[in-house]
Amino acid sequence: AKRIVLKLINNRDELVKPMASTLAQVYKNVTRCNSCGSLKSNLKGCVNCENLKEKYTKICVVEDIADQWSIENSNIFQGYFHILGGTISSVGQRKEDLLIDSLVERVNRDNIEEVILATSATVEGQTTAYYIQDSLKNTNTKVTKLAQGLPVGGEIESLDDGTLFSAFKNRSNLNSNSD
């Protein structure tokens, strides 16, 4: 951070003025889409809603756009994204502040077959996932949640109790002749 500040100070005309102009344009022209929660340009529309040429049957629900980008970069999911804009918390964020109602609308409107809840393994993330599951109970949509447990390359001795508990609870059967 110090190096960045020094670089900006030493190259004020070259870097700071164009950066300030760009930030002002972003502030003026980029907002949050009311339907999916992604970034929306006043000039081009929503990246998620406008550019979808495929007809998907799944929606992956994430807390913020950084979560969407991580999942997209993994190339593991093909479908729509829905960005909540946070999680339900006991201090601050309320369920009304999140885009849960628009998720239910999208599920009904777009004939979504599965909603994948990709919220954090925190108390707030799990509370939010439970609330979404409850909000979708009157639809015919399958609601799933990402598995939790041991991270790839993780050492057992360095894991916290919650991760170990989740790993034991969500363990897989390795016998091929049974479920």
Please annotate each region the language model reported.
Residues 27, 56, 80, 130-131:
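Sequence-level detector for tyrosine residue identity
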Residues 2-6, 17, 21, 34, ...:
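Solvent-exposed alpha-helical segments within well-ordered globular domains of core cellular machineries
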Residues 13, 26, 39-42, 93, ...:
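Conserved phosphate/pyrophosphate-binding and hydrolysis machinery centered on Walker-type P-loop NTPases
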Residues 48, 93, 154-156:
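Short, solvent-exposed polar/charged micro-motifs at secondary-structure junctions
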Residues 9, 19-22, 57, 89, ...:
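Residues at structural and domain junctions
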Residues 51-119:
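Extended interfacial segments that mediate partner engagement and assembly in macromolecular machines
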Residues 2-68, 173:
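Cys/His-rich Zn2+-binding cysteine-cluster or related metal-binding knuckle/ribbon modules and their
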